[in-house]
């Protein structure tokens, strides 16, 4: 099995934490991608989506999307599943969807600010996304902190979101530390509690 990841990608981090949680490091060839946009990068050669994370199963089949990859690895692993069963499953997956939605809203803006001059930014769209994010982050803060210090696929993604946001705060132009201190405090406690979260983030 092969796994291509970027050290800053919150989606790739979720997969990486799943690998670490289930002690699959010896079974998965973990490849760090320096430039995800490089068309010559191995993950872009056979993967039509050309997105990070990228994963190739031992059969040679490509798996697309961080949730699918994480669930595949979770089923291979022997540790406690990161995907709960029963009615808890839908609550956890709902939190996961909120965190992913915030990332999907925000990451293109970060890329736009990185690669385009300010006069070419879509500022009205940025304002609209920021308003959505504020509402979504308020909900996420409530739901995530209600989970307590528990490790599941949703809390992993929320931690990855917050740490990534803090890394890109200057570019995003909005502080989670100032506006959502409970979410920030919860994230710090999660990182301090679970070694796999610490091991998956070098910033």
Residue ranges and their predicted role:
Residues 87, 151-153, 201-203:
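Short, surface-exposed recognition loops or helix-turn segments adjacent to catalytic cores
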Residues 70, 74, 93-96, 137, ...:
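Non-transmembrane alpha-helical segments in soluble domains
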Residues 79, 142-150, 194-200:
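Surface-exposed helix-capping loop/turn segments at secondary-structure junctions
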Residues 99-186:
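GST-like fold's C-terminal all-alpha helical module
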Residues 1-123:
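GST-like domain detector, emphasizing the conserved glutathione-binding G-site
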């Amino acid at each position: 099995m092969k796994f291509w990841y970027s050290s800053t990608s919150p989606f790739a981090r979720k997969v990486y934490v799943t690998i670490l949680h289930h002690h699959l490091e010896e079974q998965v060839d973990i490849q760090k991608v320096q430039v995800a946009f490089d068309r010559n990068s191995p993950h872009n050669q056979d993967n039509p989506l050309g997105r990070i994370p990228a994963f190739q199963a031992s059969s040679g089949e490509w798996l697309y999307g961080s949730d699918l990859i994480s669930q595949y690895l979770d089923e291979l692993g022997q540790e406690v599943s990161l995907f709960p069963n029963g009615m808890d499953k839908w609550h956890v997956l709902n939190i996961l969807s909120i965190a992913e939605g915030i990332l999907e809203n925000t990451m293109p803006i970060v890329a736009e600010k990185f690669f385009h001059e300010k006069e070419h930014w879509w500022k009205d769209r940025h304002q609209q996304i920021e308003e959505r994010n504020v509402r979504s982050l308020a909900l996420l803060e409530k739901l995530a902190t209600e989970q307590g210090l528990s490790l599941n696929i949703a809390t992993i993604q929320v931690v990855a979101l917050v740490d990534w946001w803090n890394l890109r705060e200057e570019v995003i132009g909005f502080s989670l530390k100032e506006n959502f201190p409970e979410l920030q405090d919860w994230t710090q406690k999660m990182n301090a509690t679970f070694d796999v979260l610490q091991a998956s983030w070098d910033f």
